[in-house]
Curated annotation (Swiss-Prot):
Residues 1-21 form the signal peptide. Residues 22-48, 65-68 form a propeptide. The modification Sulfotyrosine is found at residue 63. GO terms for molecular function: acetylcholine receptor inhibitor activity; ion channel regulator activity; toxin activity. Transmembrane segments: none annotated. GO terms for cellular component: extracellular region; host cell postsynaptic membrane. This is Alpha-conotoxin-like Ca1.2. Disulfide bonds join 50-56, 51-64. Expressed by the venom duct. The lineage of its organism: Eukaryota, Metazoa, Spiralia, Lophotrochozoa, Mollusca. It comes from Conus caracteristicus (Characteristic cone). Alpha-conotoxins act on postsynaptic membranes, they bind to the nicotinic acetylcholine receptors (nAChR) and thus inhibit them. Has possibly a distinct nAChR binding mode from other alpha-conotoxins, due to a different three residue motif (lacks the Ser-Xaa-Pro motif).
């Protein structure tokens, strides 16, 4: 295998790695955004004291950790 052929194979491997990395990164952005939104809602409810109030806690059970 000549130097030119080895260099071509190297470039193809780099390109394939970049494409796979880029597409998997974009796929995870949606999951990260959803988790970030839920976390920010939980922080907002907790800071306001909502999770300490029974009625508010029942209405926001998903954010306050369930019904107790």
């Amino acid at each position: 295998m000549g130097m030119r052929m080895m260099f071509t194979v190297f470039l193809l491997v780099v390109l394939a790695t970049t494409v796979v990395s880029f597409t998997s990164d974009r796929a995870s952005e949606g999951r990260n955004a959803a988790a970030k939104d839920k976390a920010s809602d939980l922080v907002a409810l907790t800071v306001r004291g909502c999770c300490a109030i029974r009625e508010c806690r029942l209405q926001n059970a998903a954010y306050c950790g369930g019904i107790y």
